């Protein structure tokens, strides 16, 4: 059994290692706080085709495997890139499984859309505990027995951080 990366996988790893070395210096990571997101970096990242990795080719994506996404995530993590790639990849794949190859999902391959999942079912009011929720344009959520796709402009501001509050 050969566990080495294929040539295509090695090319993905090399591409994103170089991309993040060039595009994500420490100063850029620091400037992305407290939101933890850099919109300009996301647009550059999307230009590589990475935002469409969770989508089939028919929707403008590349239909790559989770292993390919893991290689991108490893490169992203190595530079602490302030991007919601894993959230977007997982949500994109799940949306395709739920909705099929609906053309409305093609927007997720572009530089302006970010998808994510609500971690808990919505009982009333807005969804809570949504990774990348402050920047996501598409949120997949469960409400009772229905799966909902919520699309609206993200708030663009972080939730209050109570970690440093006095007890």
Where are each of the predicted segments found?
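FAD-binding core of flavoproteins
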Residues: 93, 101-167
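Short, surface-exposed linear patches
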Residues: 26-27, 43, 74-77, 95, ...
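Residue-level signal for alpha-helical context at structural boundaries
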Residues: 34, 38, 90-91, 109
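Catalytic-loop motifs flanking and including active-site residues across diverse enzymes
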Residues: 65-68, 87-91, 135
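Predominant activation on well-ordered alpha-helical scaffold segments within soluble catalytic domains
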Residues: 17, 70-74, 89-96, 105
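N-terminal glycine-rich flavin-associated loop
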Residues: 31, 83-100
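Amphipathic, small/basic residue-rich leader segments at the start of a protein or domain
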Residues: 1-82
């Amino acid at each position: 059994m050969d566990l080495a990366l294929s040539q295509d996988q090695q090319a993905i790893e090399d591409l994103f290692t170089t991309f993040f070395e060039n595009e994500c210096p420490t100063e850029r990571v620091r400037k992305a706080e407290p939101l933890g997101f850099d919109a300009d970096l996301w647009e550059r990242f999307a230009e590589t085709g990475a935002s469409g990795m969770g989508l089939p080719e028919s929707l403008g994506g590349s239909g790559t495997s989770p292993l390919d996404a893991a290689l991108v995530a490893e490169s992203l993590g190595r530079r602490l890139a302030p991007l919601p790639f894993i959230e977007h990849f997982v949500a994109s794949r799940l949306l395709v499984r739920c909705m099929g190859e609906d053309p409305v999902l093609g927007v997720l391959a572009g530089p302006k859309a970010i998808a994510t999942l609500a971690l808990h079912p919505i009982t009333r009011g807005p969804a809570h505990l949504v990774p990348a929720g402050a920047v996501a344009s598409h949120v997949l959520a469960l409400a009772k027995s229905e799966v909902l796709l919520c699309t609206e402009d993200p708030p663009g501001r972080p939730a209050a951080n109570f970690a440093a509050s006095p007890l």
